[in-house]
């Protein structure tokens, strides 16, 4: 992956760091804005050609269950 073209930070301890422009950080509480309810903590991120900024969210109601969502589908929980 070309890290210079997609805003990804440099490799840290053999793992990718969050993008420098990330909307959410690891551990942030978020929920889906609409549709089926999902609320939890950000545990990772991903990027694809169609989703340049997406997050893996572990459910607060069902620990261990993780769903991935594009940034536009999520909002921060106070």
Swiss-Prot record:
Entry's InterPro entries? Dhfr_type_II, Elect_transpt_acc-like_dom_sf, MscS_beta-dom_sf
Molecular function in Gene Ontology: dihydrofolate reductase activity
UniProt keyword annotations, A-Z: Antibiotic resistance, Methotrexate resistance, NADP, One-carbon metabolism, Oxidoreductase, Plasmid, Trimethoprim resistance
Which EC class is the enzyme in? oxidoreductase
Pathway(s) this gene product operates in, as recorded in its UniProt entry: Cofactor biosynthesis; tetrahydrofolate biosynthesis; 5,6,7,8-tetrahydrofolate from 7,8-dihydrofolate: step 1/1
What Gene Ontology terms for biological process does this UniProt record contain? one-carbon metabolic process; response to antibiotic; response to methotrexate; response to xenobiotic stimulus; tetrahydrofolate biosynthetic process
The record's SUPFAM superfamilies line, in alphabetical order, gives:
Electron transport accessory proteins (SSF50090)
Key word NADP present: yes
Binding positions for NADP(+)? 32, 66-69
Q: Which residues are recorded as binding substrate?
A: 68
Quote the function comment for this protein. Key enzyme in folate metabolism. Catalyzes an essential reaction for de novo glycine and purine synthesis, and for DNA precursor synthesis.
Remaining remarks: Type II plasmid-specified enzyme is practically insensitive to trimethoprim and methotrexate.
Domain characteristics, as noted in the entry: The active site is situated at the inner surface of a pore formed by the four subunits.
Per its record, how is this protein called by name? Dihydrofolate reductase type 2
Q: Which organism is it from?
A: Escherichia coli
């Amino acid at each position: 992956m070309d890290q210079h073209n997609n805003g990804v930070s440099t490799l840290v301890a053999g793992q990718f760091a969050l993008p420098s422009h990330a909307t959410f950080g690891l551990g942030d509480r978020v929920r889906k804005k609409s549709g089926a309810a999902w609320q939890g903590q950000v545990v990772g991120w991903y990027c694809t050609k169609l989703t340049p900024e997406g997050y893996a969210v572990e459910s607060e109601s069902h620990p261990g269950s993780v769903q991935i969502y594009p940034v536009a589908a999520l909002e921060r929980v106070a």
